């Protein structure tokens, strides 16, 4: 983990808007792009009028906690014979068909469900499984359901349930872990990746002894891809010593001992990952320590840690805004939600699933057991052009479907703070600069500080045939004047979006 080198010195005290540090569009997008997958124009306007970030965070988290899990598909508990019979009846219904269907459902949930699904995606990259290893689409569906159930719940319960889930048992060879041939894979990853961190608070002896305590989850009643159950005859029924505690430990004991004996290490490791994902890749150890204490105080409930973080001065510090490179899901789904794209002629869910896969983020199927590393991995040269053109595809589809919606989006857009108001149709002539500034601040997390780049963006917005340069002059008068109520503003906004896609700051959130 990188030491804290950031300039963000703010604390976890609650952020309260003030004239010196107002609640504005930038902070609203910062919250929604981190805690969810972007905000619609209506949601931004509502958040701005509320002027109470703490209450907004509580509402978003409360909604996530109250949300029902996604209903399982008809095939969510099929075994291998069921899938083979379905494929025999229809050649198109092979395993990849069901996997795509499950992933499309996740993408649809990411679009709609904000906080719960943001955490579901986060945990899928923490408790990693790969569908090409366990193969069963039903296991994938059950795993996804488990992520949703525990996304904001109790982390100790999460660790318990994930370790004996069908997908994880197969993925990390728990289903091969028997008394005379203990398999150490899951025991190692339980500590190294899921709870403690690499070489942090455990020994090789702890791994070996833990693997014995985890034996026995191997029984499928001879049903391929059926539920994997505990078989006491395959359990290592002997004394084991884990973290200095000796006894004839089994699965339940491992979890209890881990959280009793390594409480602070577990809390710190998980909170450091939450911090890196939601605030900055550069760790602030003092802030993480406070988050960890909140985690412990609340008996490893996840939601209180999130409430504390997302309400804090630290989270809304300018150094935290625009500090993270967008993942493919961030890039595509946030833009989709923020622009309010609605194209009845396109299967948006399938398009987004396939696009983020091509860009390196195949949902429910990270690249390896350590998951997607993110950050600069997302913008390697071979992926960057694909990121640009995928966003352009969305822009062009929206334009071809309803160009008028482009002007409608601009009209009424908030300028910055509630006191500054919204873009209204009375704007004309040189007031075009107000529109450009509002759009730049809306789509770039920290605006554009480089004057040359900003002027280029402004030039692109202004440079259309309908509005010669004289239309923007202070002495311009009707009909030879730019006005926000003109239909050609749609073309200006289209040109603006097409241009900003290539600007490096657009890749940040």
Give the role of each language-model region.
Residues 27, 31-35, 39-148, 460-472:
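N-terminal accessory alpha/beta regions
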Residues 2-10, 77, 84-88, 95, ...:
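Active-site substrate-binding loop specific to GH73 endo-beta-N-acetylglucosaminidase modules
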Residues 41-44, 115-116, 131-136, 171, ...:
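Short, solvent-exposed secondary-structure capping/transition elements
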Residues 31, 47, 59-60, 161, ...:
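Generic alpha-helical secondary-structure signal
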Residues 27, 43, 52-56, 60, ...:
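Exposed alpha-helical structural elements
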Residues 49-56, 68-71, 223-225, 260-265, ...:
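Intrinsically disordered, low-complexity coil segments
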């Amino acid at each position: 983990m990188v030491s804290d080198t950031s300039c963000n010195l703010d604390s976890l005290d609650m952020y309260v808007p003030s004239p010196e540090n107002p609640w504005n569009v930038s902070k609203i997008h910062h919250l929604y792009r981190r805690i969810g997958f972007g905000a619609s124009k209506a949601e931004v306007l509502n958040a701005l009028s509320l002027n109470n970030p703490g209450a907004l965070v509580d509402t978003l988290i409360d909604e996530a906690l109250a949300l029902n899990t996604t209903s399982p598909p008809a095939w969510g508990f099929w075994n291998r014979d069921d899938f083979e019979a379905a494929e025999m009846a229809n050649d198109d219904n092979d395993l990849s068909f069901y996997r795509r269907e499950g992933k499309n459902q996740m993408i649809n949930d990411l679009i709609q469900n904000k906080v719960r699904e943001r955490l579901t995606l986060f945990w899928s990259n923490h408790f990693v499984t790969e569908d090409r290893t366990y193969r069963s689409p039903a296991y994938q569906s059950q795993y996804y359901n488990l992520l949703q159930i525990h996304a904001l719940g109790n982390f100790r319960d999460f660790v318990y349930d994930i370790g004996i889930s069908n997908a994880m048992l197969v993925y990390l060879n728990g289903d091969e872990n028997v008394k005379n041939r203990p398999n150490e894979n899951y025991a190692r990853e339980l500590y190294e990746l899921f709870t403690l961190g690499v070489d942090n608070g455990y020994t090789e002896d702890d791994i070996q002894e833990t693997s014995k305590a985890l034996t026995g989850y191997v029984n499928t009643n001879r049903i391929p891809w059926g539920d994997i159950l505990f078989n006491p005859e395959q359990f290592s029924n002997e004394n084991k010593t884990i973290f200095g505690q000796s006894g004839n430990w089994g699965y339940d004991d491992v979890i209890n001992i881990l959280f009793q004996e390594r409480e602070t290490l577990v809390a710190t490791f998980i909170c450091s990952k939450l911090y890196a994902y939601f605030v900055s890749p550069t760790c602030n150890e003092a802030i993480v320590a406070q988050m960890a204490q909140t985690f412990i105080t609340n008996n490893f409930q996840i939601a209180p840690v999130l409430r504390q973080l997302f309400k804090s001065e630290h989270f809304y510090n300018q150094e935290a805004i625009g500090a993270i490179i967008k993942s493919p899901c961030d890039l595509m789904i946030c833009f989709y939600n923020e622009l309010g794209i609605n194209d009845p002629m396109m299967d948006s869910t399938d398009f987004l699933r396939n696009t983020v896969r091509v860009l390196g983020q195949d949902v429910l199927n990270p690249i390896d057991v350590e998951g997607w590393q993110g950050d600069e991995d997302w913008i390697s040269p071979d992926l960057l052009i694909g990121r640009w053109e995928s966003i352009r595809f969305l822009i062009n589809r929206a334009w071809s479907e309803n160009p008028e919606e482009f002007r409608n989006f601009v009209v009424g857009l908030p300028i910055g703070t509630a006191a500054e108001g919204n873009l209204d149709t009375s704007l004309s002539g040189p007031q075009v600069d107000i529109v450009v500034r509002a759009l730049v601040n809306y789509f770039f997390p920290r605006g554009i500080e480089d004057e040359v780049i900003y002027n280029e963006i402004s030039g692109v917005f202004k440079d259309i045939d309908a509005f010669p340069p004289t239309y923007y002059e202070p002495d311009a008068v009707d009909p030879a004047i730019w006005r926000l109520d003109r239909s050609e503003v749609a073309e200006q906004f289209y040109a603006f979006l097409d241009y900003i896609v290539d600007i490096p700051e657009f890749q940040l959130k």
